[in-house]
Amino acid sequence: METSTFTTKVGLAQMLKGGVIMDVVTPDQAKIAEEAGAVAVMALERVPADIRKDGGVARMSDPEMIQGIIEAVTIPVMAKSRIGHFVEAQILEAIGVDYIDESEVLTPADEEHHTNKHNFKVPFVCGARNLGEALRRITEGAAMIRTKGEAGTGNVVEAVRHARTMFAEIRRLQTLDPDELFVAAKNLQAPYELVKQIAELGRLPVVNFAAGGIATPADAALMMQLGVDGVFVGSGIFKSGNPAKRAKAIVEATTHFRDAKLLAEISRNLGEAMVGINIDTIPENELLAKRGW
């Protein structure tokens, strides 16, 4: 039963492949995202840039606010729970969100355990900086993986690092013989069967999106050309000068990511991009990607 449920959840996440998922804080923003062609929206009270700026403890959003967004659009709605906060996840499942993001953008509730995602019918998405983190999340029941990037910075460098790291580690697995795969599984702290499956597939067995710092159509196309299955755009759209136009351009860039002429065309006159942050100016203890294990 558990296996078939997991397969169903992976299949639901698969339906988002090739698309853009946008952070929205109001029903109106959700409508703009839907009209621009987003495959799903992420309902939250504050985009990561504001969470980063405001500090304090970031928790699950008010169910009333999430409900308002669910009612405003026809596309799937995601919402974030804190790492390890399985009760927030239970609440999100109860109000009918389509996917739950167990997110390092919110303040972790448990420093040792992530949520056991097999206990839920709703599919989970989780962040990962490398193959080991991705495999541990999949083992816990994640139906979708995304790079952690460094959310709220408008700086794509960490998302690029995480994607390249993961793809390089997968390529390395493909060169190993069966005996060496046992050692690799031990080093990755992941089940041998899963490691073996990835070596055979040459990719993760679930969809793998890019997230964290994607602010322009070029950023989205870069991540797609690196080999991810789709992109999350958080602060990059509604912190920019012309959200509707930028949202549409990022969707087009994600679809036509190899067409440089089109990318040039849709990158024109988008208004001000969000103000970015250089990662090396962020104090170590404020880096969101380091949360989770």
Curated annotation (Swiss-Prot):
It is an enzyme of class 4 (lyase). It comes from the Bacteria. GO terms for biological process: amino acid metabolic process; pyridoxal phosphate biosynthetic process; pyridoxine biosynthetic process. InterPro entries: Aldolase_TIM (IPR013785), PdxS/SNZ (IPR001852), PdxS/SNZ_N (IPR033755), RibuloseP-bd_barrel (IPR011060). GO terms for molecular function: pyridoxal 5'-phosphate synthase (glutamine hydrolysing) activity. Its EC number is 4.3.3.6. Keywords: Lyase, Pyridoxal phosphate, Schiff base. Coiled coil: none annotated. Pathway: Cofactor biosynthesis; pyridoxal 5'-phosphate biosynthesis. The active site is at K80 (schiff-base intermediate with d-ribose 5-phosphate). D-ribose 5-phosphate binds at D23, G152, G213, G234, S235. Signal peptide: none annotated. It catalyses: aldehydo-D-ribose 5-phosphate + D-glyceraldehyde 3-phosphate + L-glutamine = pyridoxal 5'-phosphate + L-glutamate + phosphate + 3 H2O + H(+). D-glyceraldehyde 3-phosphate binds at R164. In the presence of PdxT, forms a dodecamer of heterodimers. Catalyzes the formation of pyridoxal 5'-phosphate from ribose 5-phosphate (RBP), glyceraldehyde 3-phosphate (G3P) and ammonia. The ammonia is provided by the PdxT subunit. Can also use ribulose 5-phosphate and dihydroxyacetone phosphate as substrates, resulting from enzyme-catalyzed isomerization of RBP and G3P, respectively. Belongs to the PdxS/SNZ family. NCBIfam families: PRK04180.1, pyridoxal 5'-phosphate synthase lyase subunit PdxS. This is Pyridoxal 5'-phosphate synthase subunit PdxS. It comes from Herpetosiphon aurantiacus (strain ATCC 23779 / DSM 785 / 114-95).
